[in-house]
Amino acid sequence: MLSRKGLNMSDEFKITLAQLNATVGDLSGNNQKVMEAWEIARDERSDLIAFPEMFITGYNPQDLILKNAFQKAATSSIEQIAAACSQGPAIAIGGPFCDGDKLYNSYYILAGGKIQAVIKKHHLPNEEVFDEVRLFSSGNVDGPFQIGKMRIGSPICEDAWHSDIVETLAETGAQTLLVPNGSPYYRGKTDIRQNVMVSRVVESGLPLVYLNLVGGQDDQVFDGGSFVLNPGGELVLQLPQFEENIATCVFRKSAEGWLANTGKKSRIL
């Protein structure tokens, strides 16, 4: 199928970024946000809609995540979303994953009415406002997942601040990096994030989608400010800070691999 510009539509891949405000503990409210955003992505004919780190539970859940009943309810909510969204864009969403007596900060890939893959966070932050070592187990490094014609690697937040995870994903066939985050704001944080992510892009030669939460939880403020980088580190999409925003990024296949089209670049602090 050809577009009006004569491009082969099979060489396009659309990712919708859902930069939204999840509420800790409000599984039904967060579920509703997912459904509403998914409908927008479906209308955009996106291939995938992505949500930030631990979105279904809200972040940072602290000791609430240690309650077995809450873990089961969160997993059930993700399963319900998968079943309800079987016809349309795939979904990537953060949530807890239990395996025996181990609990993981994870990223679920939902498609065809089912959970197709679960990515587990490897590097757990244990400093400043984070004490994930107490709450979660460190997962093995997972390879990329396939959605349609694109192989996507998802280092979860802290994992993208270490070169080893991205290196492994690139070596195992990832074509694009999707990084879900719950990254709190402080002055100068945007430049720090982008500099680190540019390093990952240059090292891997892959485009990168950085997706962050927005909103507040206890003493933490999540500023959003999600962005997309092309190989070489070029900034091609910048979402606003401190507000919810849903944006669709169109990737096109070239001889060098997948490249993101240039979109809106919001002013950042």
Model-derived regions: residue spans:
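Enzyme catalytic cores with a strong preference for nitrogen-chemistry domains
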Residues: 2-269
